[in-house]
Amino acid sequence: MLFRPKPTPCLKDMTEGRTELARAKVNLTLHVGASIQSGKWRGYHPLESLVVFANFGDTLSFKPSRNGTMEFEGPFGEVLCDQENNSIWDALELAKAPPHDTTIDKQIPIAAGLGGGTADAAAVLRAFDPNRKIHPIKIGADGPVCHLSRTAMMEGIGEVVSPLPGLGQISAVLVNPNVAVSTGAVFNAMDSRLRDENPAMTARDGSLLSRALSGTNDMQDFAIAQVPIINDVLRALAQATGCELARMSGSGATCFGIFRSDAQATAAANAISQAQEGWWVRACRLGDDVQDIVT
């Protein structure tokens, strides 16, 4: 699947190609305040979120070339192949990247609450803006935390990111019913109910699981109202042996289940896959252990 993007301005060239892994993002908690009514961030929603990253993601490969092409591979590559405007191209323009042949192995579902598009854009910035002259908030609210790509607390409108090293990993299953959710529509539904600009707070100490259990995803009920099958996904995860928490990530529709062990997570993923052949299901680890990151 190949298309040729618009030419990019050539400021400098890299003599060798490079590869970046855009890890899937999961919001273990997501608290949302009422939209800001004045100032620089007027119209944005203040957020507070405990964010972790999976041990898989999209792989972006860049190779210097004269004109530059973009090729999508993987199970979700075909969805993006026909789109000239995508987050990767936008980030290449933002970074004023020189022409490269770019290959994207797309493993993260589209519009799924896993930050795939923003993670891809952040990977571009890591590759072509190593000195961080461009603030990652320019690629979206998830931009700064996806640029870090490590366990962190995200606050403000997403521009405040506090790394949380040393919390390790948890076993998990991610499930998406192959239904897209409109983030804008969910926020619009929330706006009629939100009154306080100050979002709730996640616990600041304890394990990843205990911190996750201390909070909620404020977008979950609103997303379910629009896409009821999300509730079926949550039920399937919650009923699986060893599941300690089932919750939606981001604005959905992907949900995660936290399990006591990798073995229980794998068993749950296999059972859900067999029961729901049309769903995307993946057992993984969430959190930071670089040696376990796979592509």
Model region roles, listed by residue range:
Residues T29, T103-D105, K138-G140, H147, ...:
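Short beta-strand segments
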Residues F62, M70, L148-L245, R260-T266, ...:
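Conserved, helical-rich catalytic subdomain that frames metal- and/or nucleotide-binding sites
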